Amino acid sequence: MYKLVLIRHGESQWNLENRFTGWTDVDLTETGREQARKAGELLKREGYAFDLAYTSVLKRAIRTLWIALDALDAMYTPVGINWRLNERHYGQLQGLNKAETAAKYGDEQVLIWRRAYAIAPEPLDLEDPRHPRFDGRYAKIPADQLPATECLKDTVARVLPFWNESIAPAIRAGRRVLVAAHGNSLRALIKHLDNVSDDDIVGVNIPTGQPLVYELDEDLKPIRHYYLGDAAEIEAAMAAVAAQGKAKKD
């Protein structure tokens, strides 16, 4: 049996402000740093150790990983950083407040933009300074692979090659792997691992800073999965994620 641990980055500044973040490179809040520290301490307390870790090129995920590994007394752990683990790109929605956007367009439309499997928001214009082609960290990525917007289907297509070429072979080689990434890149992995339907993935919400453990058989099929930590706290955090895209009630 193999084990894989997934963790969504701790609360970011734009999580706090309830804004669509996507590929915008915002940092963790103090709460987010504390979540990452507690995640690392929990993993250490439960006896987890890692041979290899992976994360995205966005600082909120990188810093979460650093802080968690520090709490594990394991900052020597080799880390693979790859853009394919980035958050889903939200196109023109990036930077907008989710509740204000819901008040303008309706809760249902925002839910579609946030969670529909195959519907993407309007793309960024090629000349928009937020377009990833203007960001030096993507300079070596072919321009036709850089998204101006994505739906979850696109995110799955981006993430799975990295799973197949890097993460899965490492697990099969017996390496204990930790992945610190984002809500939607992790939803992409979960959809693949659990064979979640296009309809059911809409209801999957991943809380920030909570380690999710997958026990996998020799074919990397899930035997079971579970969050570490307090069940009530995790349920409340999931509900909070689900409510982010709803208009505020007066």
Swiss-Prot record:
Keywords: Gluconeogenesis, Glycolysis, Isomerase. InterPro entries: His_Pase_superF_clade-1, His_PPase_superfam, PG/BPGM_mutase_AS, Phosphogly_mut1. GO terms for biological process: gluconeogenesis; glycolytic process. Its EC number is 5.4.2.11. The active site is at H9 (tele-phosphohistidine intermediate), E87 (proton donor/acceptor). One of its GO terms (molecular function) is phosphoglycerate mutase activity. It comes from the Bacteria. The record marks H182 as: Transition state stabilizer. Homodimer. Belongs to the phosphoglycerate mutase family. BPG-dependent PGAM subfamily. Catalyzes the interconversion of 2-phosphoglycerate and 3-phosphoglycerate. This is 2,3-bisphosphoglycerate-dependent phosphoglycerate mutase.
